[in-house]
Structure formats: C-alpha cells, structure tokens
C-alpha cells in the first residue's frame, strides 16, 4: 500500500510531518478520510481532531481551525493552532490539557466542542 505524505503547520512552525496510511480530517461539512490516490481538493477545517494512521499506530492532533490541501499523494494542513497528542509520551496529559484549552477557545458552539473534548479524553 502506497503511503500518503502529511504535514501540519501552524504560524509558529511545523507540528507534524511524515508518511502515513490514512488521515481523517475535521471538515466543516463533517469528518472525512483521505487515502493515497484521493482526489485533489482544498477545504476549510473546523475545530477537531486530525486522526493519523501510520504503519504501527494511530496518532492525533487537535486543531482549532485551518485549511487542508489534499492531492493524490499528500495532505498539507495549515492550522491556526494545533497540539500533537502522542500516545506513550511523558507529556501526554499536558498535551491533552493544552488541546482542551485550544478547542474551548476556538468555538462558542459548546455542543460541538464537548463532542471533540470527549473524543480527546478517550485517547
């Protein structure tokens, strides 16, 4: 299976880069998945969690909002704010706290924020 290249960038710099099997993005019209060979598109992202599936594990990045450019072999995400939540990391609890704060500050839609926060807490 061919791998998809992904990069997640915020104004302060790069948050994540790598080759992955798939990505699930929080689009404004709902979540959508991307595999290698996906159609080209540019879309607006809402506050949510970017789910990244690598060869060995799933990784998660909370974003407050941004844009994604998808081509058949790569996904480039430009987000206003992002927090990488790495499983097994010593600072995972701190990352989850920062992700919650980022999302709470991102939207006044409490229902949408609470569903994303529930997803983060289940990681």
Curated annotation (Swiss-Prot):
One of its GO terms (cellular component) is proton-transporting ATP synthase complex. F-type ATPases have 2 components, CF(1) - the catalytic core - and CF(0) - the membrane proton channel. CF(1) has five subunits: alpha(3), beta(3), gamma(1), delta(1), epsilon(1). CF(0) has three main subunits: a, b and c. The lineage of its organism: Bacteria, Pseudomonadati, Campylobacterota, Epsilonproteobacteria, Campylobacterales. It is found in: Cell inner membrane. It comes from the Bacteria. Its main location: membrane. One of its GO terms (molecular function) is ATP binding. This is ATP synthase epsilon chain. The keyword Hydrolase does not apply. CDD domains: F1-ATPase_delta.
């Amino acid at each position: 299976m061919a791998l998809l290249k992904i990069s997640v960038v915020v104004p302060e710099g790069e948050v994540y880069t790598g080759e992955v099997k798939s990505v699930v993005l929080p689009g404004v019209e709902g979540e959508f998945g991307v595999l290698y060979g996906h159609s080209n598109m540019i879309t607006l992202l809402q506050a949510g969690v970017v789910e990244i599936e690598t060869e060995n594990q799933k990784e998660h990045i909370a974003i407050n909002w941004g844009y994604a450019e998808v081509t058949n072999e790569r996904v480039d995400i430009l987000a206003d704010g992002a927090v990488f939540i790495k499983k097994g990391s010593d600072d995972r609890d701190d990352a989850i706290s920062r992700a919650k704060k980022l999302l709470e500050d991102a939207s006044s839609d409490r229902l949408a924020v609470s569903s994303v926060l529930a997803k983060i807490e289940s990681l």
